Regions:
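Histidine-centered active-site loop/cap adjacent to the catalytic His
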Residues: 231-267
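Soluble non-cytosolic domains of exported or imported proteins
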Residues: 61-65, 132-140, 189-196, 240-248
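Short aromatic-enriched loop/helix-cap "lid" or pocket-rim segments at secondary-structure transitions
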Residues: 66-67, 98-99, 168-172, 227-232
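Conserved SGNH/GDSL esterase-like catalytic core that processes O-acyl groups on lipids
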Residues: 46-54, 59-140
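A short helix->loop->beta-strand "cap" motif at the edges of active sites that frequently abuts
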Residues: 152-155
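Substrate-gating cap/lid alpha-helix
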Residues: 168-219
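Short, solvent-exposed beta-strand-terminating loops
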Residues: 159-173, 222-223
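N-terminal secretory targeting modules
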Residues: 1-55, 59-65, 75-81, 114-116, ...
Length: 267
């Protein structure tokens, strides 16, 4: 009898510890990062060269193969030497992207920020939407990303959350991930299949903070007006990432915005 009580007590204790541990993980997963204050090592910028960095998620990571093309486009339009560097993390949410801005080495983008580029293209949001992080968490960390860039004198170029086949993403995920996302959807009150609320929330954030004049915002409809359904030719077979044609179209749109902005600014 005593042995059974001991066994039951041990099992109960293990369950309790497991629940507490899961609770801490859950809390950390949805936690809001605090703003990190960084002191730049470099305080000078090469006025003869337009420097553009592309940071964020997988769209930034895979753009590295097209850096030379974007560089050529900008140089042809703006008539100034241009440097383009892309570095992103596949699957990164805005929280991770912000933290990477303060990390040196292969896993961070701090070294790119400290180049003091003229522009920083930011691709973020699709992974927040898929993981159901909620618009509050998404906008909080996106706001920190924008503030970090502006504090360094870098103009953000915000790429609106793209039109992709989100259902195709879910279909490829393991059952555990699907369950986790449904729980997250319930916890954050984020719709399971609708992602327009993330776009709307980001637009409102930019307007409310009155920073819309300090950045460039590129709606997805501006470079892909037909939307995902009629633009399969722009995406890879995974239904999520741009192929070469997609990047060429996006780069053309980015170039136009940089040309317009640089025409009104003297670097």
């Amino acid at each position: 009898m005593i042995r059974k009580v001991i066994i039951i007590s041990i099992i109960f204790l293990l369950l309790l510890v497991s629940l507490i541990y899961i609770g801490f993980i859950f809390r950390d997963y949805f936690s809001f990062s605090e703003e990190i204050v960084s002191r730049p090592r470099n305080t000078t910028r090469n006025s003869d060269t337009i420097t553009v960095i592309f940071i964020g998620d997988s769209w930034a990571a895979y753009h590295s193969q097209n850096d030379q093309h974007l560089k050529t486009c900008i140089e042809a339009k703006v008539k100034k030497p241009t440097k383009v560097i892309s570095k992103g993390t596949v699957g990164a949410k805005t929280k991770t992207i912000y933290k990477e801005m303060h990390i040196d080495g292969p896993s961070g983008t701090k070294e790119l920020i400290e180049l003091l580029p003229n522009y920083a293209i930011v691709s973020a949001g699709i992974n927040d939407a898929v993981a159901k992080m909620g618009t509050d968490n998404y906008c909080h960390h996106y706001s920190l990303i924008i503030k970090r860039l502006l504090s360094a004198g870098i103009k953000p170029i915000i790429i609106d959350m793209p039109q992709v086949d989100y259902r195709a993403v879910y279909q490829r995920e393991p059952i555990i991930a699907k369950i986790r996302h449904r729980i997250s959807s319930w916890y954050t009150d984020a719709p399971l299949w609708t992602f327009e609320n993330y776009r709307t929330a980001l637009r409102l954030l930019i307007r409310q903070d009155e920073i819309n004049n300090l950045l460039i915002y590129i709606p997805s409809s501006e470079w892909n007006a037909e939307g995902y359904a009629d633009s399969r030719m722009l995406y890879k077979d995974d239904h999520v990432h741009l192929n070469e044609n997609g990047y060429l179209l996006l780069d053309s749109c980015i170039t136009s915005h940089i040309y317009i902005d640089s025409s009104s600014n003297l670097y």
